[in-house]
């Protein structure tokens, strides 16, 4: 699975890069310190997964997602758990990791990313029609 990291903090990128290197199925293509560089890259390259920090100086992670026409799967990374509810308003966001990220938790998020999307069953409404 081809992935990129977008995080304005060098330490954050290094830690997530190390976590990626421990997952054989991940191919880390690039790391970006800002969303603008990443947008240019995504316009020319195919990516399956974005590991995206929420707090960045030029864009928030949510602002960045809004710029994407067909976003790939996204795992949000942040030191702030306050955005979790907002995160799941986006279909492309498959997980939300709070820093510091435990290796086991990272692996679990990657497994979710690798899983095929679940098919939502239509709800069946029961009608009690009187004849």
Name the predicted role of every residue range.
Residues 1-3:
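Extreme N-terminal starter segment of soluble prokaryotic enzymes
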Residues 39-41, 48-121:
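CheY-like receiver
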Residues 125-131:
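C-terminal output/effector regions of signal-responsive regulators
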């Amino acid at each position: 699975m081809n992935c990129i990291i977008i995080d304005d903090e060098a330490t954050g990128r290094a830690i997530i890069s190390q976590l990626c290197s421990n997952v054989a199925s991940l191919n880390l293509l690039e790391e970006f310190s800002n969303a603008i560089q990443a947008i240019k890259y995504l316009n020319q390259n195919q990516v399956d997964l974005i590991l995206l920090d929420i707090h960045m100086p030029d864009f928030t992670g949510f602002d960045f997602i809004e710029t994407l026409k067909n976003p790939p799967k996204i795992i949000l990374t942040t030191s702030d758990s306050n955005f979790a509810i907002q995160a799941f308003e986006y279909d492309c966001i498959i997980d939300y990791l709070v820093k510091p990220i435990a290796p086991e938790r990272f692996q679990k998020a990657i497994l979710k990313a690798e899983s095929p999307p679940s098919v939502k069953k239509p709800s069946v409404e029961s009608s009690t029609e009187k004849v």
